[in-house]
Each structure stands twice: as C-alpha cells, then as structure tokens.
C-alpha cells in the first residue's frame, strides 16, 4: 500500500439506515412484536430508539410508557421482532450509492467493515442484498457483549480490519451510532437516510452530515480520502 493510501482513514459502517433502507421495516416489526406482548406504542417513539441494543431499546420504551413486562415477555421480544422483520424484509433495498461507495473504498485499498446492533438472524441477509463477498468484515450484536451506544461493535470491527480506532471514521444514521463512535474514539459521519435530522446528528457529534451513501461517495475528499493520482 502506498504512503498516500496508508494515510487515508478506515471506514466502519452501520447497516440499517446507513447501507440498506430498512429502518422503517424495523420500526413496524418492533411495533408488531410489542403488540404481541400487550404493549401499544406510536411508531415515532419506536423510531427514536432504532439503532440501540435490543435490551436498552426495550428498557427505554417501557420507561417512557411507565409500563412493566414480565421476564417471559422480555425474553420473547427479540424473537418476535426477528420474525416480524423477516416478513417485511422483502421490501428492503440497498440505499442509493451503498454498493458503489464500498466498491470505491475497496478500489482505493481503504479498509472498511460493517458493525450493526442487529443480530446475525436479521442482519445476515444484507450481505447478499449488498453483494458482499463472504470474507467481508461483518460484526453483529451476537459477537460483542454490549451493542450501541456502547463502543464494542466499532472497536471489534476496527480490530477485524487491523486499524487503530483513532484512524477510523464511523458512518451511521442515528444518534446512537455517533455516541458509540465518540465513546470508541473515532470520528463520526452522519447520514440522513435513517430519518434523523441534520441538526440532531450534528448535535450528537457528527463531523459531517450527508444525505446518503451516494452523497458521501461524492464528498470523500472532505473526510480525507483523496482521488487516485
């Protein structure tokens, strides 16, 4: 690798709302799962928590409701959500420019990985959707002790591609991605493709905010990725 390439940052990508257009399928899936255990909740409140670990997600929502669930219902929720998401998954598509962005980074020999709060059961099919090779560094909730907003996912992803987290850029669509990036010691980039507003992402610590992967690809120079000579 050339000196120029070695100076470029590595990239750690969130998945849902960052590379694939799946946030609202997750929102509806969580609503259906919650309804099956007797909890009715407005979808906008669910959306605000997408991207958190499942455990924190449930804890936060129940606190807002002032409700309680028995242990059996709490244990059932992840499976109910996964089943509901699988029903809605046929409507999921790659976000504009996601495959092209990853291909550009690979062509320029810039390391990248994917780190998602989703479990392998729900996140795994995205590999095929994005056309990823089998050896793509792909870290799911199953592989770490704590998911976002804890930094474990991004720290593990950085280890997978043998880069210092301080020389990595986290790309995500939610405030939870950006909080995890800050806690990990990485620079955060926000995307609007998951439904959060520009000001929210900037307030959460984003260095830059772009519309979607295509927009980021068109502005890679702004985050230290130079064009080939």
What are these regions (language model features)?
Residues 208-212:
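Short acidic-hydrophobic, aromatic-tinged amphipathic segments that line or gate anion-handling sites
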Residues 91, 113, 119-170, 175-184, ...:
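Substrate-recognition "cap/lid" segment bordering the active-site pocket of phosphatases
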Residues 2-47:
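Active-site neighborhood of HAD-like aspartate-dependent phosphohydrolases
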Residues 4-6, 107-110, 161-167, 223-227:
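Glycine-rich phosphate-binding loop signature in dinucleotide/nucleotide-binding domains
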Residues 7, 86-114, 120, 124, ...:
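Short, acidic loop-to-helix structural element flanking the phosphoryl-transfer center
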């Amino acid at each position: 690798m050339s000196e120029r390439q070695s100076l470029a940052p590595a990239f750690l990508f969130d998945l849902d709302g960052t590379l694939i257009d799946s946030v609202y399928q997750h929102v509806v899936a969580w609503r259906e799962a919650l309804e099956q255990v007797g909890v009715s909740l407005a979808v906008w409140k669910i959306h605000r928590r997408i991207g958190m670990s499942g455990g924190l997600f449930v804890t936060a929502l129940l606190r807002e409701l002032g409700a309680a669930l028995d242990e059996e219902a709490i244990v059932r929720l992840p499976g109910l959500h996964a089943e509901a998401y699988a029903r809605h998954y046929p409507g999921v598509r790659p976000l504009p420019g996601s495959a092209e962005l990853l291909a550009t980074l690979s062509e320029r020999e810039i390391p990248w990985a994917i780190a998602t709060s989703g479990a392998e059961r729900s996140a795994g099919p995205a590999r095929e959707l994005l056309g990823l090779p089998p050896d793509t560094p792909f870290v799911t909730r199953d592989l770490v002790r704590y998911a976002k907003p804890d930094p474990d996912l991004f720290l593990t992803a950085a280890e997978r591609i043998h880069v210092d987290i301080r020389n990595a850029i986290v790309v995500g669509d939610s405030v939870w991605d950006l909080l995890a990036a800050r806690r990990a010691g990485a620079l955060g980039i926000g995307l609007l493709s998951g439904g959060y507003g520009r000001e929210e992402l900037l307030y959460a610590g984003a260095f830059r905010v772009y519309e979607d992967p295509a927009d980021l690809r068109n502005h890679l120079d702004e985050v230290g990725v130079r064009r080939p000579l």
